[in-house]
Amino acid sequence: MQDYIKNVLKNMPNGWLTTTTHRLDIYNETLAKTQFIESLETLCAKNNFTHKALGKLPTAYDYIRLGHPLSCLLEWGIAKTCNLDSKSVISFSSKTIPLLAILRQNALEKKNTRIIYTHEQPNLKHLEVLKQVYGYTFSLKRVNIPEIIDSFNGSTVFMTENEDIATLDLHENIDFFVTIHKRLGSVLLVNGDHNQSYISQIQHVRRRESIAMTPVNCLVALQNLLHISVKEIPTTVKANKAAVLSSIKTITGTNTKPLVGSSGLSIQYAIMMGLVDHAMEHHKGKAIKFVVPPNCYGGTNDQARRVAASINCVEVVDLPVDGDNDMVQSLDAVLKQIAQQDAIPYIIAEIPTNPRVEVPDLDMLTKVLSTSRKTSSGEKAIAPVFILDQTFCPNVHFIGEGAVLSSVKAIAYASGSKFPSAGQCTAGYCIANKKGDVFTSKIALHLELCDNEATDLQYEILAKHLPSMNQRIIEAYKNTREFVSFIEKVLPQAKINFVSKALATQGFTPSVFSLDLPTKGNTAQERETYKRGLNHKLIKAMITQIPQQSKYCVSYGQLKGCYWTIPATSTQGTTKENDKDYIARVSVSANLDLERHKEVFLEFVKSM
C-alpha cells in the first residue's frame, strides 16, 4: 500500500495541489465522500498509478475546504495503516475543530465527554468560553500510559501531539483519537461501530465551520506517513501577513485590524461566535437574532442555522431579498419585529444579492439601519449590526470613513477563494468599521479558539494576488458587460440579472450575472422542466466546445476562463429546495477568449 501511494504522489495531476473548486460535470454530490476513494481502490487493485488514470478519477468534493484528492489519499493511507475504514479518518487544517465537532454533537445529544491527553494540556486557552458561549461540557484528564485508560459513560477523546501523524494504537476505551501536528493541522480517527453516527456530523463541521487539511499540508503529511524526508522551505510568513493586512486596509479604506481565516466560512463562523459572545457578555439574557436571506448561498444559510441549533438563545430570521422582495423594506419590517421583542439583531447579507445581482438603495439601507426603535415596553431597542458579505464586490468602499455604512456598526468580509486570491486558495478575511471595531477582539478570540487562521501558504498567495485584485475586477467587468450585451442582442427574450451601467459608475462592477433562459410549456412544472434542460444544454455546449476555458464550477473571481453553475443559489444541498433558483450563474474573468464564447452561445441560440 505504501509503495502504491508513493507512486501515486509521483504521478498525480498538478491540479491535486492547486485546484480550489472542481468541475461539477464529473461530480456526483451524493457520492462526494466515497466515489474518489472507491475509484482509487479499483486502480490500486490493478496497481495502476499512471498520470492518465489518476487524472480520470472523479471529483472529490466540490470545494477543497470540504475535502480534496490529497486529503482523501491521506485519510485512506492512515486508515489502511490503522486497519480502519477510510471514512473513519478525517483530516483538518485546524488543530482544535475535531474536538469542537465532537463536543458539539455530544452537547446536542446531552452526552458526557472526557478529554484525555498525554502531553501538556490541550491548547484550549479559552476553556470557559467553550463552556459558557458554546455550551459544551467536558472533563480533562492526563495519563502517562494510554493503556491504563478506564471505561467511561460517554465519549472519550484521546489527544496527542505527534510528528508522525498516523502512529496510533487503537484502544477499546477510546472513542476518538486526535493527532495534532503543529505545522499541518490534525487528523481524527473514529473508533468503534457505535461511533459511526458521528462521522457525517464531524464531516459537516469541517464543511461549514473549518476546512480540510490543505493540499500542500496533506502532501507533507503523506510524506511523513511514507517516511520520505521533507526539506524545510524557509517561509516569509511575517512579511506576507503584514502585506496582506495592509492590502485589506487599503482595499476597504479602513484602518481597523483585519482578520484572515482559512476560508470565508471560517471567518464567518468567527464573526458569528464573536458576536454571540459579545451579546452574552453585554446583553445578558436577551435573545440573539441572525437575520439571513433564505435563498443565499448554502454555506451562510446552513451555518447560521447550525449556530442557532446548538445555542439556545440564538434564532435565525429570514430576510427576503430577491424576486419581488426589496432588501430595505424587508429589513425595516424585520428590525421592527426584533425591536418589539427586545432582541439583538445581527444581519448577514450580500451586496449585490446572490444570485440576482441586485443592489438595494444604499441611502435607504443606511437610514433603516440607523433608525432608533422601541421595544414593546417603550425602551430603546438594541441597534443592529450589519455583517456584509462583500465577496461579489470586495473593491467597493462600504465601511471606510465617510462611506455609506460608516455611520452604523458594520463588519465586511469576503471569501478569498474568489477575487482576493484569484481562485488560488480558500482563505477569507473580515474587517470592521470604526463603530464595529468593538467586536474585533471577540471575533479574533473565536478565530484563535477554532484555530482557523489562514495558513502560511494562504498568506503567501493572498500577498501575491491582493494588490492586483481591483484591476482584475475592472477588466473582468468589461468582459462581462460585453458578454451580457451580446446575449441581450442575440436572445432578447432571456432575462438577465446584472448591475445597471448607472450602478457600475458607482463602483459596483461584478463579473457575475444570472441568466434566466426563455422557456415554454402549458404548466409551471413543464416550463420549469424545459428551462432546466435548456440550462444544461447550454452549459454542455460551453464546456465541451471551449474545454480549456469554460468550466462547470460554482465559484467566481477566477484568474482565467468562464464558470457556469446551476442552480445559481447553491450546489451544496443545504439550501431548502423551494428557495433554490434554477437559473444559470455565469462568472467571467479578465482573461478569456470572449469572441469564442460569443460564437458558441450564438450556435446554442440557433439550435433552440
Predicted regions and their residues:
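A generic secondary-structure signal marking the coil-to-beta-strand transition
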Residues: 88, 257, 409, 509-511, ...
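Conserved beta-strand positions
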Residues: 349, 388, 515, 586-588
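Short, surface-exposed acidic
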Residues: 85-87, 253-258, 522-525
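Composition-driven detection of intrinsically disordered, low-complexity segments
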Residues: 67, 92, 234-239, 392-394, ...
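Conserved PLP-enzyme active-site core in the AAT-like
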Residues: 5-8, 13, 20, 90-210, ...
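N-terminal "arm"/small-domain region of PLP-dependent enzymes with the aminotransferase-like
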Residues: 1-69, 76-80, 85, 139-239, ...
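Conserved AMP-binding/adenylate-forming core of the ANL superfamily
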Residues: 64-75, 86-94, 259-263
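Active-site C-terminal subdomain of aminotransferase-like
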Residues: 189-243, 411-579, 588-593, 600, ...
